[in-house]
Amino acid sequence: ILAATVLGAVSDFCGLRWDKLEIGRRTLVLEQLLTTGGGWQDQFGGITAGVKLLQTAKGFGQSPEVRWLPDTVFTDPAYKPCHLLYYTGITRTAKSILAEIVRRMFLNEHDELALVREMKEHGIQMYDTIQRADFQEMGRLVRQTWRQNQLLDAGTNPEAVRQLTTLIDDHCLGYKL
């Protein structure tokens, strides 16, 4: 997201008139050149406002379609106090995590590919649930996202995180790091 901010500033300063899609594309190229291993989700998600579903087609040319969602389940007075952002202070390097996930995909590991397909469908389910402003189902789906992330990357849930989530598990519909 920092790279997108810098490229946006360069565009403004130099009068290049790049739109958000172009800034996202250039950010993706920059991150690949820097070997950070980033994908398009963070770049395009960070430079397009609001709650949304981003989708792309297969292939190298990534031009995400943005489908905005209502923010009711986050801003409605009945639901707003139910959301908490908690900083654990635990840091991880995305580069090595992503490299391992991509390696397993290129090796055609069946479980990995099945999980990625399941996560894609899960994203559509979440989109539909937020469209309906179904807070209870959204919480259940967030919990499912957490389980999927742990299957995708075993390091998602270190002991320090497990200790925290054990304290709140009975009080939450879902949570995610």
Identify the meaning behind each predicted range.
Residues 1, 22-26:
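Glycine- and acidic-rich phosphate- and metal-coordinating loops
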Residues 1-16:
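DPxDG-like acidic metal-binding loop motif
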Residues 3-4, 20, 38, 47:
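Short alpha-helical patches at coil-to-helix transitions and adjacent helical residues
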Residues 13-17, 25-36, 43-176:
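C-terminal nucleotide
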